[in-house]
């Protein structure tokens, strides 16, 4: 919505109390966390995925497609040891997600929807403004007070600047009275939306609600390849974009911690109902991890 002053993104160091970061997330729907991934981890991760990134051909479509001059790569857990053994073991990420999705005594209330590297090439146009929860179209209709369905952690692998396509965020758009699609026909604020660029250094990230309006900015540079690492997480009741257990080899799955195995669908989550305990993604009422022969997480 139009305002007298440009919107401002709240920022916290990764050492700040999780409750403070979560409060800012609840208020604005997005918050920048500085130093979320240690720079040395991010540098090693970037080196490990570089050969795969170099094999991806850049598409130039000039048709408004979100892949126009953008590289995307999702096979991170099978490509990068740093990703699966270090970056995914981020305790702050889980502290925040527990506050968003989980109930006491019920384990993880969430799992990964997708994990992806997104690299915006020089000359790439600005992305269409959107809400990520449009993946589940009915969620917008439930309005701003509905539970979160999706939370993104979007990490800078290379510097994010206003010039090279830093994501444009609209803080507070998670609380707009109507969560409509962002287009001329359905959004009363269309053409009058003020956004702020997420300026970040490698290792910084923004945590974002699926309700928040955002879009990659235009990369107006001649040589900057703006590289990001995105974790998309969803409620355990929802189906993810990536069929992780069908393409992650068991050899890799066995290397993961029990918590990360659950995030990728190799373990069940539980919910306590009035008369019983239900295993989501289970096997005959038991943890799917037992069927797969994974060691006990107890």
From Swiss-Prot:
Residues the entry annotates as binding Fe cation: 130, 132, 214
Entry-linked InterPro entries: Phytyl_CoA_dOase-like (IPR008775)
Keywords linked to the UniProt accession: Dioxygenase, Iron, Metal-binding, Oxidoreductase
Function: Multifunctional dioxygenase; part of the gene cluster that mediates the biosynthesis of calidodehydroaustin, a fungal meroterpenoid. The first step of the pathway is the synthesis of 3,5-dimethylorsellinic acid by the polyketide synthase ausA. 3,5-dimethylorsellinic acid is then prenylated by the polyprenyl transferase ausN. Further epoxidation by the FAD-dependent monooxygenase ausM and cyclization by the probable terpene cyclase ausL lead to the formation of protoaustinoid A.
Keyword Zinc: no
Protein name: Multifunctional dioxygenase ausE
Additional facts recorded: In A.calidoustus, the austinoid gene cluster lies on a contiguous DNA region, while clusters from E.nidulans and P.brasilianum are split in their respective genomes. Genetic rearrangements provoked variability among the clusters and E.nidulans produces the least number of austionoid derivatives with the end products austinol and dehydroaustinol, while P.brasilianum can produce until acetoxydehydroaustin, and A.calidoustus produces the highest number of identified derivatives.
Organism name: Aspergillus calidoustus
Residues at which substrate binds: 72, 127, 167, 226
Cofactors required: Fe cation
A Pfam short name: PhyH
Catalysed reactions, as listed in the record: preaustinoid A1 + 2-oxoglutarate + O2 = preaustinoid A2 + succinate + CO2 + H2O; preaustinoid A2 + 2-oxoglutarate + O2 = preaustinoid A3 + succinate + CO2 + H2O; berkeleyone A + 2-oxoglutarate + O2 = preaustinoid A + succinate + CO2 + H2O
Pathway entry: Secondary metabolite biosynthesis; terpenoid biosynthesis
Enzyme Commission number(s): 1.14.11.-
Subunit composition and interactions: Homodimer.
Site location (Important for reaction specificity): 150, 232
Keyword Cytoplasm: no
Family assignment from sequence similarity: Belongs to the PhyH family.
GO annotation terms (biological process): terpenoid biosynthetic process
GO MF term set: dioxygenase activity; metal ion binding
